[in-house]
């Protein structure tokens, strides 16, 4: 590896800038998929209306799906980036948080298969003529419901990831304590929503969702912007990294 390559590898600021860009893309793509695509096309409790809207806006639905699959790629990279940035605080806890984030991505990726299943069921292939249109609409809607529940399940792991990364940020000394505290609260909200969705899905969707998700948005947006614009306090990061290396030497 060249000296320049080693310098880039060793620079926490490089990781921070890349993480900021990726995090902001994740937020934009996720909001597009949730608010503009599913929020505009899925009619709660009405399989036929949902099928009609998706058929009429299939390109939009596919764009949302593609964008969210790209967030999976970005989230795996974010797991590595946040591990590198926060390992001076605690190697083991940073690794645990990163693994929780990768687990979230794996479950979320599987859940997206059910959106693909809905598209297949609403397609025009000849073999689908063996089914009544109402059956296809019901099966497609059921697939979308499974996607929603799978997404909720994935948030359990994402919540633990956010809460633990938030704790590490708050204790780091080279990233804002307030952002860390907000991320901890947001992570607890994700955990509470995920568990509530499994125990009382209707209550979780109608009552808890907006309130439990509220702290998470400013925390994640703030972290993305901070990483992109300010980065980390390199001197403090290097001091903690050096202290750890001396301790294990």
Where are these regions (language model features)?
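Hydrophobic, aromatic-enriched alpha-helical segments typical of multi-pass transmembrane helices
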Residues: 1-249
